[in-house]
């Protein structure tokens, strides 16, 4: 109430203006021009992003893989996502005083004076196809031990809606002792890296961004906009951005599953699937997908993340899981169809020699993560077939470690084999002289060879 003082005058007591705590904390944000960025995880996603930011900011790239860090410190990227000359142009050493550039390390303490942390670690599934968030949790624990007021933590790893705020924020709060949206903030900007694609590189793909408050959303968006020439799209909240990413890959998985199922049907009907798709594709709104193996660390994994969250919410997803089952069956299908063709030609199956061309999960890329070529291999081996695998792109040591099989980087004599399966459409394979004959079966999984030169294709 107003108080009465002499001469019948009144005054109103001054009440302190209440400023929301989040706004007070946001005032602690460093201007982007003064920011130092930490990239946690330097794989197919993290390294290209780190290099892009390093052209405008001081960046610390962190990875727990000592061999990977040593390779990058020497200016070489075995994934081939970043050209060596570009990587070398931004690399900094420990004593380098340049204002911008990339310093790569395995030492978590080197991140201590960063104010923006970007997490780009893998999000795999276990053998039961359940999401594994351990890499994200470990990364969050590392960051939490260094977190200071005014810092921003941005996640890029593909997850189901809610992971950032429901799973990672509690880790950050517990270890740091800081309060979310008062002392520190979060953002989510899903990665859209397409391994092996030299046209759609990280800065040329439109980036979805989001933040834990409207002000932080603007901050995160401005950060990415400063390096992404394709532009950005600011989502309304973190969960929307998370959901958008996981359905990108789920939609593609389902569309490929549809044409894979068509391939099985048309094979029984004696119709060429690729010719059907070509004819149907003459309509303007027909979606053009081709049958094939669906592997890699994204399309073959991410639908399980969405399915997990749906089941937690009490809904059993039908189409998503059906698509996964269908696509996971294709490797076995290819092997069995090849064996049928061998029998039609009266070729010996048991102890026969068979060559698989390609082992990576996609063409012209060294990435062997979650490759479904392994399904073809195992199914053939179950028939006591002697299987050789040739892939000039894949690292034999990595394949041996991950899959316990031996592959070769040297092309053998194609004539030595009763059957050849072209599993991955590397450009070099398209130049090989593969011709069907009475003594050899040729199966073209991707449909890239002349139809008249092969016995079968999906």
Where are each of the predicted segments found?
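Structural/interface elements that position substrates and couple domains in central-metabolism enzymes
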Residues: 2-5, 10-13, 23-458
